[in-house]
């Protein structure tokens, strides 16, 4: 099926969903992109052709002020549970002296919370998962143990997209593996991540009895680095980015204005993209353009796989009653590669020559300048930060009851609102006890009645998030943020204040002009932090490189020296709850 025909099929599926019988339980599909920038896809101003996502946007709603976490695993934990990342157990991507051994920092899903998979399974849904997990790889935290009937899971945070499954770096190696229904599996020669995840999901949906509803979690690893795509997809974008950073950025800004996401009088961040491009030699420009070409190919390929999913829904008669959510975990990744705490020897295995960029055996990242383009209108601050560019990401929803087709809504919505929203659409009681002991109540609120137009006032007025002492508190048009530089010891920084109505791109800190507001908002944030189990990051950074099979303890190391941290400071798996 060609792209136009596929997009037309998607449009028919999504339009039909709006007319499904309300008493029939909807299928629910959550699709996640990994490290994707705010304006990469066409529904949010991107030049990369994404016809299937565009059709979804036109038949559903876009939330332009959707807030998430600065990084992947914490965001996924909030999404899957409706709780804060600390409540879920993912208070960090690593530890500090002050957080290791503390509740909220187990670095895996705990039984303090209930997952969407567990609740949908209890309600009779066939619960399916394909793609990135990143929520724990110790007993009790795997997809099968957290509610999925079937799961084809990449367990770690990132890997190469072909069948060689090379880890992101030295310390990532121990959780770089795939499982199918809990058993480790090898990958076929023709494996490419996005295609394999969609193919497996399509197969499971087709095998599900027609009378049984489906809850599907399709978590692409695209476009997370290393940037890789099949040759035929890379060729489609040949020459497209040789105009350089600034021109692509300007075109995206113009489209964002046309969509109404920003306005003509919106203050823009200071960038020198023309200067940065002109500082490159012609050979460097050609190489850098090729890297972005690969990135675009990854997103276009992902969209095509979403199209195959839509076709499967049509073939199985589920097209008129499927609630579809698309989002990304965090902002664009500005890293330039050769990081992830790896040894120099690790990087010697890659062939990053021009001809091999994007192919198996290469490892490239697009760096801060393309990240500024990818994340437009946000710039300078991206993934890992509490700036808008780190936590304000794409969100779309379509299906039964979503009637405001094509609308872009600027109401504040939180990542932990997704679970309660989907529960209400499916008629699931989120307070029903599924465990032997009580779990924490969700902090998210349902947007169901707002999304269907039953009420006109959005249910959320504020949003809080914390990760590694990066913090943000959004209250209406005001935002308080703390930007902490990343290093081998925990940092600190004063609060900054921004008026998102006048300055949505955070170009002018007005904290000094509004001390009373800073005080009130910081007190509100501290109350949120206390309620959601936040422990302030202090002291040295501590990473983990595996699990000791003899003692059942995490193998914790000092990343500055890669020497083990004394065993008493590590967390016994048996004590994690």
Curated annotation (Swiss-Prot):
It catalyses: an aryl sulfate + H2O = a phenol + sulfate + H(+). The gene is atsA. It is found in: Periplasm. One of its GO terms (cellular component) is periplasmic space. Plays an important role in the mineralization of sulfates. It holds the Pfam family Sulfatase. Its EC number is 3.1.6.1. The active site is at residues 72, 134. One of its GO terms (molecular function) is metal ion binding. Coiled coil: none annotated. The modification 3-oxoalanine (Ser) is found at residue 72. This is Arylsulfatase. Residues 1-20 form the signal peptide. It comes from Klebsiella pneumoniae. The conversion to 3-oxoalanine (also known as C-formylglycine, FGly), of a serine or cysteine residue in prokaryotes and of a cysteine residue in eukaryotes, is critical for catalytic activity. Disulfide bonds: none annotated. Gene3D superfamilies: 3.30.1120.10, Alkaline Phosphatase, subunit A (3.40.720.10). Belongs to the sulfatase family. Ca(2+) binds at residues 34-35, 72, 329-330. Its cofactor is Ca(2+). CDD domains: PAS_like. Binds 1 Ca(2+) ion per subunit. Keywords: Calcium, Hydrolase, Metal-binding, Periplasm, Signal.
């Amino acid at each position: 099926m060609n792209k136009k025909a596929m997009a037309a099929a998607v449009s028919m599926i999504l339009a039909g969903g709006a007319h499904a019988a309300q008493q029939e339980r909807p299928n629910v599909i959550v699709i996640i992109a990994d490290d994707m920038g705010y304006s990469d896809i066409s529904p949010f101003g991107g030049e990369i052709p994404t016809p299937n996502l565009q059709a979804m946007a036109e038949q559903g709603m876009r939330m332009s002020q959707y807030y998430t976490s600065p990084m992947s695993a914490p965001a996924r934990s909030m999404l899957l549970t409706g709780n804060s990342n600390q409540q879920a157990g993912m208070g960090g991507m690593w530890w500090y002296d002050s957080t290791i051994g503390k509740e909220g920092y187990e670095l895996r899903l705990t039984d303090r919370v209930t997952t969407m998979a567990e609740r949908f399974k209890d309600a009779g849904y066939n619960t399916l998962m394909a793609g990135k997990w990143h929520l724990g790889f110790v007993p009790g935290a795997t997809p099968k143990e957290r509610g999925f009937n079937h799961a084809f899971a990449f367990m770690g945070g990132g890997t190469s997209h072909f069948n060689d499954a090379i880890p992101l770096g030295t310390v990532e190696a121990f959780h770089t593996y795939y499982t199918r229904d809990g058993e480790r599996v090898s990958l076929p020669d023709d494996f490419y991540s996005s295609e394999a995840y969609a193919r497996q999901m399509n197969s499971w949906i087709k095998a599900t009895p027609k009378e049984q509803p489906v809850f599907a979690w399709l978590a692409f690893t695209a476009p997370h680095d290393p940037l890789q795509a099949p040759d035929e997809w890379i060729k489609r974008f040949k020459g497209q980015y040789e105009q350089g950073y600034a021109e692509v950025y300007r075109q995206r800004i113009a489209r964002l204005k046309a969509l109404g996401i920003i306005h003509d009088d919106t203050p823009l961040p200071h960038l020198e993209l023309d200067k940065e491009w002109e500082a490159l030699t012609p050979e460097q420009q050609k190489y850098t353009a090729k890297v972005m070409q690969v990135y675009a190919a990854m997103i276009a390929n992902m969209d095509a796989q979403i199209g195959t999913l839509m076709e499967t829904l049509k073939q199985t008669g589920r097209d008129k009653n499927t609630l579809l959510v698309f989002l990304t975990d965090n902002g664009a990744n500005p890293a330039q590669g050769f990081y992830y705490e790896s040894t120099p020897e690790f990087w010697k295995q890659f062939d990053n020559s021009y001809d091999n960029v994007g192919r198996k055996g290469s490892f490239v990242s697009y760096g801060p300048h393309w990240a500024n383009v990818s994340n437009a209108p946000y710039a300078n601050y991206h993934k890992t930060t509490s700036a808008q560019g780190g936590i304000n990401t794409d969100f779309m929803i379509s299906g039964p009851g979503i009637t405001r087709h094509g609308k872009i809504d600027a109401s504040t919505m939180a990542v932990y609102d997704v679970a309660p929203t989907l529960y209400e659409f499916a008629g699931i009681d989120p307070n029903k006890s599924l465990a032997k002991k009580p779990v924490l109540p969700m902090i998210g609120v349902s947007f169901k009645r707002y999304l269907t137009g039953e009420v006109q006032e959005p249910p959320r007025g504020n949003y809080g998030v914390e990760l590694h002492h990066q913090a943000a508190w959004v209250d209406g048009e005001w935002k308080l943020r703390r930007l902490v530089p990343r290093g081998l010891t925990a940092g600190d920084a004063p609060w900054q204040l921004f008026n998102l109505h006048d300055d949505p791109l955070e170009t002018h800190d007005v904290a000094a002009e509004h001390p009373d507001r800073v005080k009130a908002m910081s007190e509100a944030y501290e109350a949120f932090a206390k309620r959601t189990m936040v422990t302030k990051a202090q002291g040295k950074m501590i990473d983990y490189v595996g699990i000791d099979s003899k003692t059942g303890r995490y193998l914790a190391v000092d990343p500055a020296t890669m020497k083990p941290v004394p065993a008493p400071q590590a967390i016994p798996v048996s004590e994690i709850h």
